[in-house]
């Protein structure tokens, strides 16, 4: 009797099990990579917005007064919220500015902009001589 050549059912099942485990780990790694890329994009765009906001305050004719201010804008096809806090410093002509930027929530996300912020930028503004 001639022996048939090929794989047994057990060998095929073991190979499929190994392939399934490898495929699951590859899919999991690629999903994490996509999440990280999305988070990095959010942080980059938010930092650009915060930097722009700080530059806008620097270009104003009069230095900003102490207190909080907030607003919304569209940037890169998305809605964003920003909040600035201006504080006086020991130096009379110097102001400390904190800018928070967060993506506008789509649903019922809770929390302040400070808690949801993708970027937080601290800078100092001085009056022009």
From Swiss-Prot:
It is found in: Cell inner membrane. Cleaved by prepilin peptidase. The modification N-methylphenylalanine is found at residue 7. SUPFAM superfamilies: Pili subunits (SSF54523). InterPro entries: N_methyl_site, Pilin-like, T2SS_GspI_C, T2SS_protein-GspI. It is a single-pass membrane protein. One of its GO terms (biological process) is protein secretion by the type II secretion system. Its main location: membrane. GO terms for cellular component: plasma membrane; type II protein secretion system complex. Keywords: Cell inner membrane, Cell membrane, Membrane, Methylation, Protein transport, Transmembrane, Transmembrane helix, Transport. It comes from the Bacteria. The chain crosses the membrane at residues 7-27. Residues 1-6 form a propeptide. Disruption phenotype: Deletion mutant results in a non-functional T2SS system. Pfam families: N_methyl (PF07963), T2SSI (PF02501). Component of the type II secretion system required for the energy-dependent secretion of extracellular factors such as proteases and toxins from the periplasm. Part of the pseudopilus tip complex that is critical for the recognition and binding of secretion substrates. Type II pseudopilus confers increased bacterial adhesive capabilities. Type II secretion is composed of four main components: the outer membrane complex, the inner membrane complex, the cytoplasmic secretion ATPase and the periplasm-spanning pseudopilus. Forms the tip of the type II pseudopilus by interacting with XcpU, XcpW and XcpX. Interacts with core component XcpT. Belongs to the GSP I family. This is Type II secretion system protein I. The gene is xcpV.
């Amino acid at each position: 009797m001639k022996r048939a050549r090929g794989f047994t059912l057990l060998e095929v099942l073991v190979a499929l099990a190994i392939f399934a485990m490898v495929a699951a780990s590859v899919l999991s790694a690629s999903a994490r990579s996509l999440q990280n890329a999305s988070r990095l994009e959010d942080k980059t765009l938010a930092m650009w917005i915060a930097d722009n906001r700080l530059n806008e305050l620097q270009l104003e004719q009069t230095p900003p007064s102490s207190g909080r201010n907030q607003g919304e804008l569209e940037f890169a096809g998305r809605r964003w919220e920003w909040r600035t806090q201006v504080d006086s410093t020991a130096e009379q002509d110097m102001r400390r500015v904190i800018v928070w930027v967060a993506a506008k929530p789509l649903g019922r996300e809770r929390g302040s902009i400070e808690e949801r912020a993708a970027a937080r930028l601290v800078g100092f503004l001085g009056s022009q001589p």
